[in-house]
């Protein structure tokens, strides 16, 4: 009788021990899976996510290095969308430059000067990229793993290429300001049409269509650059 009771008691302890070890194992796995907060390079204080201060240590106020995982849309406080409020984008750009521009770090350590240069370059690149519809669209595609190498005629049909050639010929032959303005108006209207259609393609998640339209838009952007150069006095 005693032997049966001992075996029963031993079984209870085994169940309890297994449960205890299981909880310990789950706890250690959760701790291992939890990401470790980055530390300030200057004071070693943990930089907590979501603390509201993206660029400076909340403890010692030292400028921190740029976050390599952050995309341009996040940096500039924009939704990851082809449709961007350019006025808000400009305000964000000015705000960031007041925070990280190298002129404000001339008396700081070499490390902070270096980080300031990195931040300022990143902010400039983000602003220029998101400001223009073409570069914004190409960047959105890049975030999807899709790139259009320069000089690619992706789905540019012969009729479209003839249209581009004719506009370039008109531009080369333009002898008056009125002729130049007519070409410029044509190009501006085409770019507006492309912008609207590209926005629709991204909203529908049709990245192939967006890629096709952005390829064509790049041709007209090149013509726009030629028009600007023709207006620049020598």
UniProtKB/Swiss-Prot annotation:
GO MF annotation terms: ATPase activator activity; metal ion binding; protein-folding chaperone binding
Pathway recorded for this protein: Cofactor biosynthesis; iron-sulfur cluster biosynthesis
Gene null: resulting phenotype: Knockout of the gene is embryonic lethal. Specific loss of the gene in erythroblasts is also lethal due to anemia.
J domain location: 71-143
Residues the record lists as binding a divalent metal cation: 40, 43, 57, 60
Biological process annotations from GO: [2Fe-2S] cluster assembly; primitive erythrocyte differentiation; primitive hemopoiesis; protein complex oligomerization
One matching Pfam family: HscB_4_cys
GO (cellular component) term, any one: mitochondrion
Gene3D superfamilies reported in the protein's UniProt record: DnaJ domain (1.10.287.110), HscB, C-terminal domain (1.20.1280.20)
Assigned keywords, A-Z: Chaperone, Cytoplasm, Metal-binding, Mitochondrion
Residue intervals passing through the bilayer: none
Coiled-coil features, chain-numbered ranges: none
Domain of life: Eukaryota
Similarity field: Belongs to the HscB family.
The protein's name in its UniProt record: Iron-sulfur cluster co-chaperone protein HscB
Organism: Mus musculus
Lineage, uppermost ranks: Eukaryota, Metazoa, Chordata, Craniata, Vertebrata
